[in-house]
């Protein structure tokens, strides 16, 4: 019985060195070959080994027809049994398989038939027949018996696995192999015992891989892939390189499995049951096959600017000590893939030698990494992080993990994919140097770019939103799959935050579609941060919102407002103070938005102030909200004083008095509040639907109409298509139920907020089950609804003391806020050009406050803290977008 060294020498004599001359001839033969998984035609026990007897299966079509097995498979099983029966009585002696002999019989290219017969290798020319038979017999046994008399269950069950039928094989794997591997440990196991265990698992691996390549059902395929992953990921393979023969066996079978995976990825469609299997094998090959990481990262072709952008986010001092901490986990072959690493383009295919067919990184299978919606890259990334979580200890210094093999390069590729999702063009960057807080004047060339830079393809279509939602869905799935390791989740969360920051830095400020999608992406990712308890730095995103507002483009300003509105629940007190007291409620900024010339901007900003800044969500924010309330009250009183002075000036100079009638947010349109079911759409803060143009149905009764926001109870084809049976009105009741009550409402109440029904308490819910969404929908012009100047004047008169929501008034009862320095204002004079909008803005604000109070009145008792704020979203109407650019 030969020892391990003799077995290795015999195998090497049969296979030749890693790069044989005959293999090099094959590379230059010029024949067109295709990559296929290997199916070895096995031989009888005493037949000489012919390394040319290799079967190649046909291509897999879209229906995934696996490789066929020849009749010699039965001979292979009988051979295994005959060899295994002679060693069953040896204590803990691993059962034989054709795996070792397979290694010798696969010395030729196992994945394609050579076009030239002269290139085929003959085993007799490499080694004599007696030496080959000796190698086969040697690889079927292990040299040293164990001291323990206990038999190895893996060896015994492997013989049963060979002799059983196909269905029984699956039962054996489910009932024995998978549970046994889950409980199998290598603690206090000697090296000889560990080597025999590895060889036994190698036999299982080879046999299961052959079964996986055959024509099997989906359930069997899932079982076989789980078994291979359980074997390949088992910790017994750690430091297998110390044993030359076992390391060779492990490299060969892993390479064969990788070749099978590459063939699967090259098919037109990949079964979902094989996605995790393929990604896991690629990750194992990335870390365990020499030079595969270099070829793989080179094939991804990540741009250098993205690697630099992401790599610069981490401290370079950590790179100096990173090799010291990472050396115990990785061999020297990975030193070239650690940061800083820029993949070098290479045209040579990847191979481990031993006459294995090289793997070419063609578009046929690398295309799965290029798709941002396919999800395979995210599956690979989650498996990558899972592997690191198992390998690294928790005592590593901060940021050392970022210098692991391929870490920066892979996440730079994530940055590149993210940028491609929102269709970034190489134009002006979004961010300006720090300190750019003032609104630019109209003469700056960057404020008034050419018409080409505006990109008039305005509406964000359902396709782009669907792509974005799929992208974020893959990100969420990646975090869930590494849920067993909280530290690895935190590392990926930190990298994702840096990815989003770099995406914003590469976003053109005047490409509205990119800006819209960027805001939607960040809003959803902030929800991911909140779900996984990641604290992010919001100061950068405040500068992003400032940059959008500084463009002076109406829709960019509206999108920045809705962005703040959507992410508000995820902010801490410090971030909320930065948004309110140090930015939006600062005198100049508040005047710019509250008295903006566009009624659409005013409508959105006023709802941001009312529903977010003044609404009390948590009693812990009582002090902060009191300061904000006083600041808003003082600003409103200041604007009313300015309006009164301007009104007197107009009377003295004989000019027309300022108009008090509110303006429509969008010409010939109104904002409509509709409801989407809370359970159906989850916690999304930006659920959006595109409502097409349609005419109001005849007989529809207008329930409640205001000049800034209108609450529509009409059923239309567009609303039915978007919401179906879940369509509700503002009270959360079916529209038909309330329309009956609305017949009793007089036309005189159309412009004031009154109870929708005579007895609203009878139909109220104790908890809010729907969240509201502001939407555009067509309506008749407000001018046709009648004149109610007296009511507008009454609303304006109330502004003399500052109109505040009822809920906010309780904050003023706390005397500690009276002398709060942050609540005072400097009394900045109102710009003369904006005085004309003061009266309208104050009336519109009063209507917004009434709208808020009316929603609170629909709540039972005083349960206002848990009340959901409306989801404020924006979609640019097509007609409005076309009018902007024409």
Curated annotation (Swiss-Prot):
The chain crosses the membrane at residues 277-297, 374-394, 400-420. It is a multi-pass membrane protein. Its main location: membrane. Residues 87-112 are annotated as: Disordered. Belongs to the UPF0592 family. Coiled coil: none annotated. GO terms for molecular function: MAP-kinase scaffold activity. Residues 95-112 have a biased composition (Low complexity). Keywords: Membrane, Transmembrane, Transmembrane helix. It is found in: Membrane. Pfam families: DUF1765. The keyword Ribosomal protein does not apply. GO terms for cellular component: membrane. The keyword Lipid biosynthesis does not apply. This is UPF0592 membrane protein C7D4.03c.
């Amino acid at each position: 019985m030969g020892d391990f060294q003799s077995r290795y020498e015999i195998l090497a004599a049969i296979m030749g060195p890693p790069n044989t001359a005959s293999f090099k001839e094959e590379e230059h033969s010029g024949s067109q070959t295709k990559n296929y998984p290997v199916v070895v035609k096995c031989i009888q026990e005493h037949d000489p080994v012919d390394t040319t007897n290799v079967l190649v299966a046909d291509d897999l079509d879209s229906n995934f027809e696996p490789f066929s097995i020849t009749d010699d498979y039965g001979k292979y099983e009988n051979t295994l049994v005959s060899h295994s029966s002679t060693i069953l009585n040896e204590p803990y002696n691993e059962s034989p398989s054709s795996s070792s002999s397979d290694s010798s019989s696969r010395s030729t290219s196992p994945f394609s038939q050579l076009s030239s017969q002269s290139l085929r290798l003959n085993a007799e020319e490499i080694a004599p027949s007696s030496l080959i038979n000796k190698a086969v017999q040697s690889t079927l046994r292990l040299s040293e018996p164990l001291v323990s008399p206990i038999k190895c269950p893996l060896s015994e069950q492997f013989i049963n696995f060979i002799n059983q039928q196909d269905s029984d094989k699956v039962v054996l794997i489910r009932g024995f192999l998978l549970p046994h591997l889950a409980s199998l440990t290598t603690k206090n196991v000697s090296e000889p015992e560990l080597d025999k265990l590895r060889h036994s698992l190698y036999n299982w691996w080879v046999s299961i891989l052959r079964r996986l390549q055959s024509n099997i059902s989906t359930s069997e395929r899932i079982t076989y892939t789980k078994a291979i992953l359980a074997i390949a990921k088992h910790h017994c393979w750690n430091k297998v390189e110390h044993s030359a023969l076992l390391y060779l066996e492990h490299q060969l079978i892993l390479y064969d499995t990788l070749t099978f995976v590459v063939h699967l990825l090259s098919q037109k469609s990949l079964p979902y049951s094989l996605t995790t299997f393929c990604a896991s094998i690629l990750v194992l090959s990335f870390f365990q096959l020499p030079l595969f990481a270099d070829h793989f990262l080179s094939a991804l072709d990540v741009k250098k600017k993205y690697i630099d952008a992401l790599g610069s986010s981490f401290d370079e001092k950590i790179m100096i000590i990173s090799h010291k901490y990472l050396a115990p986990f990785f061999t020297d072959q990975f030193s070239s893939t650690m940061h800083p690493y820029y993949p070098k383009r290479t045209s040579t295919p990847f191979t481990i030698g031993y006459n294995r067919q090289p793997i070419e990184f063609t578009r046929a299978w690398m295309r799965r990494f290029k798709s941002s919606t396919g999800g395979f890259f995210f599956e690979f990334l989650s498996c990558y992080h899972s592997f690191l979580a198992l390998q690294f200890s928790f005592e590593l210094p901060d940021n050392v993990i970022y210098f692991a093999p391929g870490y920066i390069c892979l996440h730079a590729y994530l940055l590149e994919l993210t940028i491609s999702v929102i269709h970034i063009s190489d134009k002006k960057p979004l961010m300006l140097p720090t300190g750019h807080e003032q609104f630019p004047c109209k003469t700056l060339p960057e404020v008034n770019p050419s018409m080409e830079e505006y990109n008039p393809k305005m509406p964000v279509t359902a396709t782009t939103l669907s792509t974005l939602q799929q992208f974020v869905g893959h990100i969420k799935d990646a975090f869930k799959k590494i849920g067993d390791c909280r530290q690895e989740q935190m590392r990926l969360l930190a990298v994702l935050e840096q990815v989003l920051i770099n995406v914003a830095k590469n976003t053109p400020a005047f490409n509205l579609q990119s800006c819209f999608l960027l805001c939607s992406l960040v809003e959803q990712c902030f929800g991911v941060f909140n779900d996984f308890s990641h604290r992010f730095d919001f100061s950068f995103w405040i500068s992003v919102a400032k940059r959008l507002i500084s463009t002076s483009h109406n829709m960019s300003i509206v999108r920045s407002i809705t962005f703040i509105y959507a992410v508000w629940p995820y902010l801490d007190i410090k971030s909320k103070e930065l948004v309110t007291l140090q930015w939006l409620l600062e005198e100049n900024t508040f005047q710019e938005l509250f008295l903006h010339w566009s009624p659409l901007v005013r409508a959105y900003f006023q709802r941001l102030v009312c529903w977010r800044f003044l609404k009390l969500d948590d009693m812990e924010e009582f002090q902060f909200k009191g300061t904000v309330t006083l600041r808003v009250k003082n600003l409103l009183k200041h604007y009313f004083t300015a309006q009164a002075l301007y009104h007197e000036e107009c009377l003295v100079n004989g000019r027309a008095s300022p108009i008090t009638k509110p303006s429509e947010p969008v010409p010939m349109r109104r904002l409509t509040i509709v409801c989407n079911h809370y359970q159906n759409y989850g916690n999304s803060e930006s659920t959006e639907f595109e409502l097409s143009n349609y005419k109001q149905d005849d007989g529809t009764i207008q329930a409640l109409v205001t000049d800034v926001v209108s609450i529509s109870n009409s059923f239309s084809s567009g609303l039915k298509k978007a919401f179906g049976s879940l369509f509700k009105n503002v009270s959360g009741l079916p529209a038909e139920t309330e329309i009956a009550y609305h017949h009793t409402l007089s036309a005189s109440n159309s412009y004031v907020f009154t109870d929708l029904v005579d007895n609203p308490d009878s139909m109220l819910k104790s908890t809010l089950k729907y969240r509201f969404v502001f939407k555009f929908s067509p309506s008749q012009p407000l001018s046709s609804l009648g004149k109610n100047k007296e009511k507008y004047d009454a609303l304006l008169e109330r502004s003399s003391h500052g109109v505040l929501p009822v809920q906010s008034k309780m904050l003023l009862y706390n005397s500690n806020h009276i002398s709060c320095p942050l609540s005072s204002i400097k009394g900045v004079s109102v710009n003369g050009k904006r005085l004309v909008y003061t009266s309208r803005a104050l009336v519109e604000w009063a209507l917004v406050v009434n709208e808020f109070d009316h929603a609170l009145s629909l709540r039972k008792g005083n349960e206002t803290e848990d009340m959901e704020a409306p989801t404020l979203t924006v979609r640019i109407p097509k007609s409005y977008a076309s009018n902007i650019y024409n």
